[in-house]
Amino acid sequence: MGLLTFSINVTLDGCVDHQEGIADDETHAFFTRLMDEGGAMLWGRVTYEMMESYWPAVARGDAEAPPAMREWAVKLEAKPKYVVSSMRKDFPWTNSHHIAGDLRTGVQKLKDATPAGVLLGSGTLATELDRLDLIDEYKFLVHPRIAGHGPTLYQSGLPSTRRLELVSAKPLRSGVVAMHYRTYRRDRGAVEGEGWSGGAEEGR
């Protein structure tokens, strides 16, 4: 079974608005590496549609973009992409797949079928999956910004505090800090896995 890793850009005050992040070569390289290491991407419908509206054009060369962004786009095009949605059934973007029905069952099956791990990049969906205790690791890029507005992580709340263990913290040149935490499990401490190996924004 692969790990489910939640990764997202977040400001110091918890804002996950993608326009508030620092989009430079280091941050794109960070997410490209995570995508390379993981076996699949997992998004909610809103994030999928945001990504679908831009990245396929970059991958085709129809939109201008720096080399780091183009590398990300080409690799994303080839990566299996899974979407949780109760409103939309058709997902024509290359290698896109729909997760329908019971959320716990569908995501657990995806984890079981993806030994390299699944990379989750939707904040609202992450809240739902955390309520189901399905997230194993968290790899956040914490940006040196105070946005003063939402949307924010976990703004709809969790039933209880989530206990995590720090694996590593790596500062980037821009002042962004790459934080890696794993979920604490009472039966065996933290979940297995080291370093940055293992399994990029908003909800359904």
Tell where the protein language model's regions lie, with residue ranges.
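Enzymes that bind and transform nitrogen-containing heteroaromatic metabolites
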Residues: 1-204
